């Protein structure tokens, strides 16, 4: 299936619109100036590429609930929608989705809230908490756009928005949606500036990528693209900019901040993009490089391009970061738009900043590559590539084409659960969880449940103590559950299979604890005194990066961020990757922590119970028991599982995702989206709702959440009540970890690993009736989850026969 681009929107340091920014870009106008938004007086570097301080944007009724990162994104999205002339109506909204990438999310709001807390807790507005997570961004966009399909965010740092483009293309080709609003956004923040200052990675002058390479210059902005199936675009008479062919996503498995010296991961992303596009290296006319301006990044990227494209005659390369700085999570989208404009106008933007002396030095490292120094170049461009690399060792490449091109059809593999790793309040193994289901709820401390991992666990899974100490708790529990998943699946990572295995990490709150810890250090000690030890752990994809480094897994590595259901969305994404043949095996993971910081934020919002008596489906208030953990589930193609002789716990039969926009921080009024997700999951699985035997639900004790869930089941199943099983009665509201655990619990039941007699809930007249059901004859189990803002995911697991 062809996927095409029909709309573009952008704001950055050299323009508030695509046209303004592009015209300045091709004319070599730099947006790098003295930083105005934060005080850098005590820092060694003072340059930045900031967007307009104030800009016109219609953000609707929730504008005051949005961080600058969302406002920048909404600005770009409004332009892209207008450019594409797409009309999102009640009739087509279910087939229109939103996927947005970001690195630091609502960092401005985090800084404000905790600065106010330092001055006195009564000054800190709890509403700022809703603006903080990356997960808020796509929800804000969906609300102003009216999109009701798949809605999520990608948290893979500086590769995030490139991955958002690739993920949306995958979903369109899988038939999940007709059109997507994709892109990325990040605002200028103390978090990023203080962090890169701590790493001494900033250039004190304007950055000079592929040239002096002394460091980066931070930028900010947003880029948005409307992408559609070709058939959908033609049917509405849309203007088509170009086709999106293939892409590649890889992991270095090397270092949390530094690229591999041999460029292997970067080359894998580029090679896989070429392979999935059915192109050879000689076909690429233009590459918009990642080109951050640091010595290691530039040298390894040049090495990678030389190895793949070095024999081409004059492949054009440039760094638009030389003008707009490094826009972090927005970089991929901004640079994709520049790449598309270059492709459609046959104009390569310049890489600015070369002196005559620099040009002489460039000849030695450029070889046959043309780095387009200082002046734009007009040339024929048929195929163009854009590359972005990130902390965590994540690499992403995507290829755009001026012309229609047939690419290899996707595979249609059956997908099975063949292993799992469980870290929660019951312990760190499948056996400890199974035993815990027999004894009931884990011990509650106040309103909390905690997962503990100690030295004996690290040793069991080959995690060295020196490595473990570098990790924040989120990464610690993810590494342990990931390693446990590989072991439980009987998988040994080798040079032969390391690129056949990947991972999708879902998280609601990500590394909030270390983000806050880093911010508090800046507040107390100054922007110039940030912790170089803590900063690398503030990116949402650090947990996946550390798991890759420790396990040696080098395949697809993506972090999804959209509330509690991110852990179940990870199952859907991983399912797609295996089903279409991109990877043989994928770990679908959900991870969230319960630290003092996390507890304080949920408690400030009034969500945490004080005594631990609150339980799902009690319908008494808005509070719940806060849990934590990490769940990793191995999804594997039928052919791979059979070749290995792997045990199959269950089959992933199908899934559905839907969204009904409500304000960030609530789900009240979003009921219909859960109905749609459940029905879509059943349809995808090839069954009717009547064939569902039981549900593993998401109720957590908040009466609004629980009532929406049960109301949906009553509408869908009517008098044919389905027993609802709950993992949150056992491990608390562990958010994304609980969502993935729901799928693991269903798989264990279908595989006969749990007792056939299971506690469950039935509902009558709005009340929950506790009962025990015999699960021995169950064939199909539905798993559901939710996210504040109105997103829902449903997955059907089927018994293996």
Residue ranges, per PLM feature:
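Glycine-/small-residue-rich "gating" segment that lines the acyl/pantetheine channel
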Residues: 34, 119-125, 166, 170, ...
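Active-site-proximal alpha-helical scaffold in enzymes
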Residues: 73-85, 134-138, 142-145, 149-184, ...
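ACP-dependent fatty acid/polyketide chain-elongation machinery
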Residues: 1-62, 84, 231-241, 337-352, ...
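Flexible, low-complexity linker/loop segments at domain and module junctions
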Residues: 1-5, 88-93, 277-283, 312-313, ...
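Condensing-enzyme catalytic core mediating Claisen C-C bond formation in acyl metabolism
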Residues: 2-6, 29-34, 206-277, 286, ...
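Active-site pocket-shaping loop/turn-to-helix segments
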Residues: 13, 60-78, 124-133, 151-163, ...
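Conserved beta-ketoacyl condensing-enzyme motif
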Residues: 5, 29-156, 185-193, 281-297, ...
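Acyl-CoA/ACP chain-elongation machinery
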Residues: 36, 176-214, 247-261, 286-298, ...
């Amino acid at each position: 299936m062809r996927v095409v681009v029909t709309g573009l929107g952008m704001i950055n340091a050299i323009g508030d619109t695509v046209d303004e920014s592009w015209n300045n870009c091709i004319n070599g106008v730099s947006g790098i100036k003295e930083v105005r938004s934060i005080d850098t007086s005590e820092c060694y570097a003072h340059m930045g590429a900031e967007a307009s301080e104030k800009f016109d944007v219609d953000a609707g009724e929730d504008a005051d609930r949005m961080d600058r990162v969302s406002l920048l994104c909404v600005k770009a999205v409004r332009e892209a929608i207008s450019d594409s002339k797409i009309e999102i109506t009640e009739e087509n909204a279910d087939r229109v989705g939103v996927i947005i990438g970001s690195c630091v999310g609502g960092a401005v709001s985090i800084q404000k809230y905790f600065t106010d807390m330092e001055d006195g807790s009564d000054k800190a507005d709890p509403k700022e908490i809703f603006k903080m997570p990356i997960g808020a961004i796509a929800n804000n966009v969906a609300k102003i756009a009216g999109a009701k399909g798949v809605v999520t965010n990608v948290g893979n740092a500086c590769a995030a928005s490139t991955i958002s483009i690739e993920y949306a293309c995958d979903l369109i080709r899988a038939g999940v949606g007709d059109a997507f609003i994709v892109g990325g956004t990040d605002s200028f923040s103390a978090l990023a500036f203080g962090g890169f200052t701590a790493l001494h990675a900033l250039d004190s002058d304007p950055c000079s990528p592929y040239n002096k390479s002394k460091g980066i210059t931070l930028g900010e902005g947003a880029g948005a693209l409307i992408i559609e199936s070709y058939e959908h675009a033609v049917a509405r008479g849309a203007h088509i900019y170009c086709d999106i062919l293939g892409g590649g996503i890889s992991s270095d498995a090397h270092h949390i901040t530094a690229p591999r010296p041999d460029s292997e991961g970067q080359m894998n992303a580029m090679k896989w993009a070429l392979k999935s596009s059915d192109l050879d290296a000689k076909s690429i006319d233009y590459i918009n490089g990642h080109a951050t301006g640091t010595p290691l990044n530039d040298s390894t990227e040049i090495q990678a391009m030389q190895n793949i494209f070095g024999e081409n005659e004059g492949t054009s390369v440039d760094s638009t970061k030389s003008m707009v700085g490094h826009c972090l999570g927005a970089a991929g989208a901004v640079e994709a738009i520049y790449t598309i404009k270059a492709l459609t106008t046959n104009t390569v933007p310049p890489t600015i900043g070369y002196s005559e002396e620099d040009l002489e030095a460039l000849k030695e490292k450029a070889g046959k590559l043309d780095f387009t120094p200082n002046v734009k170049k007009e040339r024929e461009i048929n195929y163009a590539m854009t590359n972005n690399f990130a902390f965590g060792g994540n690499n992403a490449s995507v290829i755009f084409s001026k012309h229609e091109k047939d690419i290899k059809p996707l595979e249609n593999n059956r997908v099975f659960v063949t292993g799992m790793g469980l870290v929660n309040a019951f312990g760190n193994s499948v056996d400890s969880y199974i035993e815990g289901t027999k004894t009931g709820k884990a011990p509650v401390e106040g309103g909390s449940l905690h997962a503990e991992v100690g030295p004996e666990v690290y040793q069991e899974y080959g995690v060295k103590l020196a490595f473990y100490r570098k990790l924040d708790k989120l990464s610690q529990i993810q590494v342990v559950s990931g390693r446990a998943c590989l072991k439980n699946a009987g998988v040994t990572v080798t040079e032969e299979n390391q690129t056949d295995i990947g991972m999708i990490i879902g998280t609601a709150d990500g590394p909030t604890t270390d983000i806050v810890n880093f911010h508090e250090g800046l507040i107390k000690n100054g922007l110039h005194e940030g912790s170089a030890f803590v900063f690398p752990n503030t990116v949402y994809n650090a947990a996946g990066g550390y798991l890759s480094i420790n396990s040696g897994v080098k395949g697809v590595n993506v972090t999804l961020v959209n509330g509690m259901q991110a852990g179940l969305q990870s199952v859907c994404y991983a399912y797609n990757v295996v089903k279409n043949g991109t990877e043989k095996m994928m770990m679908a993971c959900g991870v969230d922590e319960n630290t003092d910081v996390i507890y304080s934020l949920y408690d400030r919002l009034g969500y945490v119970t004080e005594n631990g008596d609150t339980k799902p489906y009690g319908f008494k208030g808005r509070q719940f028991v806060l849990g934590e953990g990490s769940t990793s589930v191995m999804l594997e193609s039928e052919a791979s599982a059979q070749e290995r002789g792997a045990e199959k716990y269950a089959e992933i039969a199908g899934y559905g995702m839907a969204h009904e926009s409500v304000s960030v921080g609530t789900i009240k009024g979003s009921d219909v989206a859960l109905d749609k997700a459940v029905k879509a999951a059943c349809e995808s699985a090839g069954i009717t709702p009547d064939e569902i035997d039981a549900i593993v639900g998401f109720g957590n004790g908040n009466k609004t959440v629980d009532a929406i869930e049960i109301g949906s089941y009553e509408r869908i199943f009517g008098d044919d009540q389905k027993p609802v099983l709950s993992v949150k009665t056992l491990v608390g509201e562990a958010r994304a970890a609980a969502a993935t655990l729901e799928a693991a619990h269903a798989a264990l039941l279908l595989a006969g690993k749990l007792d056939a007699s299971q506690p469950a809930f039935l509902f009558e007249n709005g009340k929950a009736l506790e009962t025990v059901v015999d699960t021995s004859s169950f064939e199909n189990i539905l798993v559901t989850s939710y996210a504040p803002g109105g997103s829902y995911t449903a997955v059907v697991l089927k018994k293996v026969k």
